[in-house]
């Protein structure tokens, strides 16, 4: 009897030990899972553990919350702004890629998600009521099927003030109702999109580029503001994070990322070596080379391409700002906003660069990172009203520069 009792005790002790071992293995598994790094590991995780229906419900709830208020009007009263159709948690010290797009150009998000590993903020402009509805459907579809969209992207919507966007009903049949993967959504978007020439909306509504830029970079400490059809070099986000984390002395400095454009048939270069090979044979050239060479010339491309190869990202040289330079840059601190009076084509970015200069910012060109625009910018690819818009904004820019003198009366700098 005593032997039987001892055997039972030993059995229960063994069972308890086995259960504890299983629990420890589960905790170890969860710990390893939470420590996954890199896109490949994340893709494997979502392949075997697809998002639960609850996460999709949360997306719908966020959309409903953002749209239910009816949005807010911008300062001009011409546009209705819906903040946070998608929201994401962002480290306040992170570098956010801020961009803007018409609905038809959202297809470029796919390339940005691949190249930029950090958080993105996207402002979408819908020129018509139908486009506003399509934008909400696209937001729902992309966030439902693309884990990266849910994890890393904040999305906002702007439309003419006379329109209101509505919550999409995923049960209704439509172009995106039966899609089941992220790639299917982008493939479908590429087929139904009708991208036209630059800024040609086909309506009497102006594209509010500076309103969209401000909305996308809102709340960011460090932001790289680019056009949606540009692609950053591979690893740029990680290199920027490492550089900025090593030093806190970047307030008042605009870290310039050199911008290029590539012949449309070419594959996007991933690193500086690939870029230089294409640059040497004329397949890559400075951004805006065929439209406004002085707009990017101060970057000093000849100096940049001849810098010695380095592994760490750093500022390579200082460039005094001069009119009409409009660089793409990363800056922290109290960065002036883009003046939202500038719409459509002309002087919308240079006006902000001018104010940066007057406000006391210095411009330093980075040694390794870069941006590439998809396709050469050509005069014939712009809409017929381009020159008229440019002349209108040129007059506004002259007024803007006079206003800066009153805004910064003690600044020794001018544009």
Curated annotation (Swiss-Prot):
UniProt xrefs under InterPro entries: B4GAT1
Lumenal side: 37-415
Entry keywords, A to Z: Glycoprotein, Glycosyltransferase, Golgi apparatus, Manganese, Membrane, Metal-binding, Signal-anchor, Transferase, Transmembrane, Transmembrane helix
Pathway of action: Protein modification; protein glycosylation
The keyword Aminoacyl-tRNA synthetase is assigned to this record: no
UniProt keyword Transmembrane helix present: yes
Reactions this protein catalyses: 3-O-[beta-D-Xyl-(1->4)-Rib-ol-P-Rib-ol-P-3-beta-D-GalNAc-(1->3)-beta-D-GlcNAc-(1->4)-(O-6-P-alpha-D-Man)]-Thr-[protein] + UDP-alpha-D-glucuronate = 3-O-[beta-D-GlcA-(1->3)-beta-D-Xyl-(1->4)-Rib-ol-P-Rib-ol-P-3-beta-D-GalNAc-(1->3)-beta-D-GlcNAc-(1->4)-(O-6-P-alpha-D-Man)]-Thr-[protein] + UDP + H(+)
Major localization listed first in the record, in broad terms: Golgi
Name recorded for this polypeptide: Beta-1,4-glucuronyltransferase 1
Taxonomy of the source species: Eukaryota, Metazoa, Chordata, Craniata, Vertebrata
């Amino acid at each position: 009897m005593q032997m039987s009792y001892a055997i039972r005790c030993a059995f229960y002790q063994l069972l308890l030990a086995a259960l504890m071992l299983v629990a420890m293995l589960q905790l170890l598994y969860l710990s390893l899972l939470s420590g996954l790094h890199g896109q490949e590991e994340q893709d494997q995780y979502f392949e075997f553990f697809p998002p639960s229906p609850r996460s999709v419900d949360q997306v719908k709830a966020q959309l409903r919350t953002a749209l239910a208020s009816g949005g807010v009007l911008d300062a001009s009263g011409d546009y209705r702004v819906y903040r946070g159709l998608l929201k994401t948690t962002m480290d306040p010290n992170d570098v956010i890629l801020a961009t803007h797009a018409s609905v038809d150009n959202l297809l470029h998000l796919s390339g940005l998600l691949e190249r930029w590993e950090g958080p993105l903020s996207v402002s979408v402009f819908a020129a018509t009521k139908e486009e506003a509805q399509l934008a909400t459907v696209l937001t729902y579809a992309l966030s439902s099927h693309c884990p990266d969209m849910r994890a890393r992207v904040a999305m906002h919507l702007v439309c003419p003030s006379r329109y209101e966007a509505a919550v999409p009903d995923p049960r209704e049949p439509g172009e995106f109702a039966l899609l089941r993967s992220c790639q299917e959504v982008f493939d479908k978007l590429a087929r139904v999109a009708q991208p036209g020439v630059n800024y040609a909306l086909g309506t009497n509504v102006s594209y509010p580029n500076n309103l969209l830029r401000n909305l996308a970079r809102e709340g960011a400490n460090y932001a790289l503001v680019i056009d949606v059809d540009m692609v950053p070099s591979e690893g740029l986000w990680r290199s920027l994070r490492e550089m900025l984390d090593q030093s806190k002395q970047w307030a008042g400095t605009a870290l310039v990322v050199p911008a290029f454009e590539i012949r449309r048939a070419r594959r996007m270069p991933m690193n500086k070596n690939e870029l230089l090979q294409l640059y040497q044979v004329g397949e890559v050239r400075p951004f805006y080379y065929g439209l406004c060479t002085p707009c990017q010339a101060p970057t000093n491309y000849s100096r940049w391409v001849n810098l010695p190869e380095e592994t760490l990202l750093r500022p390579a040289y200082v460039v005094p700002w001069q009119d009409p330079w409009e660089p793409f840059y990363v800056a922290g601190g109290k960065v002036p906003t883009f003046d939202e009076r500038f719409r459509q084509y002309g002087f919308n970015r240079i006006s902000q660069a001018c104010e940066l200069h007057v406000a006391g910012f210095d411009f330093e060109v980075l040694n390794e990172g870069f941006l590439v625009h998809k396709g050469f910018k050509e005069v014939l690819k712009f809409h017929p009203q381009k020159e008229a818009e440019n002349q209108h904004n040129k007059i506004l820019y002259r007024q803007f520069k006079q206003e800066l003198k009153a805004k910064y009366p003690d600044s020794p700098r001018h544009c």
